[in-house]
Amino acid sequence: MSLVQSLSALLFPQLNVCHLCGRALEHARLLCPDCERRARGCHLPPSQQAGYDLQQLGGTVSAFYYRGVPKQLVHLLKYQADTALAQWLGEHMAAVLARSSLANADAVIPVPLHAQRLQDRGYNQSLLLAQVLCSCTGLELISDALVRSRPTGTQVGRTRAERLQALRGAFAVSDPHRLSGKRILLVDDVLTTGATAIACAEALWWTGTISVSLVTACRAEKDA
């Protein structure tokens, strides 16, 4: 929860407030109309979805560019424990997935956190997004299929090559037989360089999966 939202909730406990700007809302919703409108301005159009192809993946789709309101929402979800925002982001991920060729996946797998990071944060934001996505689409969620076998530290500020090196061998599959012959859809919050998804895909390929694709809430712009 943001500072503005916390103050609004403290001063006006009977009101619903926008999770981003703290504006009082008449109805139970997560964002005010103005913040919703600004967020929609960052939607990733269908014509741009194919602009971030990764050879190791069957495809990628993202709901938003990683800027403006969507970027703020991801930060609130990830670092300020505003877990309610997973609902809003996950619904938009489900909508963009439904319009893509990746909607025929057999199973959804969230990108895992290392046990220590999970303990520190208290939740895995990718799992929260995956739960909403599966609720909207009816796809099967396999939440424990992947494990992060060693800590990799923050990837912020690292180059793509550095990320690939840091993440190589960082993921393992808990039960390979459960995934054999399935089309897997990975779920993560942000697609930046693709290093995390590639590392996950490399672990999953050994299980005999048919394909591994990725859906995220946001995608970094290549010139960002």
Residue ranges of predicted features:
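Glycine-rich phosphate/pyrophosphate-handling loop used in enzymes and phosphotransfer proteins
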Residues: 1-188, 192-224
